[in-house]
């Protein structure tokens, strides 16, 4: 049986100790993401607490940190400065909307170019149509100098993940879960 999960108040967690323990158990590069509710994440604390998690992650020397492009400009600039030379930055946005068209996706990504080393965009997808828009955008960018990760959540969202090598995607997220339900959620597993 797995250990029982017992929720604790946020302020009772020593972030430095927790991050060191987390990193110590993983030999591969660590990507720290602390996604807010507004972008489909599960961090339920305040924005100030979330930024504190990102700061602590950078201070701990994680390999990568995921910084949403909608973080307040002054705060994002401070985090980018802290990360410089020790932690690489993924600039991300997670839209609750479906992708409008491939050209707009490409323009959005090009507009984010200076925001991080890898540009990650994620859209809600509902099938073939939206999956093809993401695929087309990734195809159009595959030979550019931009490092990208383009994906969807929902049916059709897994196409760019599955074809990551063909599309020259620089980062593909997968799960350790298995099951036929993953495809309808736009996810792939690691095996």
Please give the residue ranges for each predicted region.
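Catalytic alpha/beta core domains of metabolic enzymes, predominantly
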Residues: 70-191
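Active-site beta->alpha loop and helix N-cap motifs at the rims of alpha/beta catalytic domains
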Residues: 2-84, 88-101
């Amino acid at each position: 049986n797995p250990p029982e999960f017992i929720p604790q108040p946020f302020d009772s967690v020593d972030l430095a100790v927790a991050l060191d323990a987390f990193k110590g158990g993983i030999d591969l590069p660590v990507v720290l993401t602390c996604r807010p509710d507004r972008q489909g994440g599960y961090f339920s604390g305040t924005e100030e607490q979330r930024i504190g998690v990102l700061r602590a992650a950078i201070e701990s020397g994680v390999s990568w940190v995921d910084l949403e492009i909608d973080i307040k400009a002054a705060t994002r600039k401070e985090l980018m400065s802290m990360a410089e030379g020790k932690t690489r930055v993924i600039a991300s946005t997670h839209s609750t909307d479906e992708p409008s068209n491939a050209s707009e996706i490409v323009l959005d990504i090009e507009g984010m170019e200076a925001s991080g080393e890898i540009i990650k965009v994620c859209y809600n997808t509902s099938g073939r149509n939206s999956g093809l828009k993401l695929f087309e955008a990734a195809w159009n960018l595959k030979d550019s100098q931009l490092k990208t990760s383009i994906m969807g959540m929902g049916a059709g969202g897994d196409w760019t993940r599955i074809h990551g090598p063909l599309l020259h995607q620089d980062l593909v997220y997968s799960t350790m879960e298995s099951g036929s339900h993953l495809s309808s959620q736009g996810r792939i597993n690691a095996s």
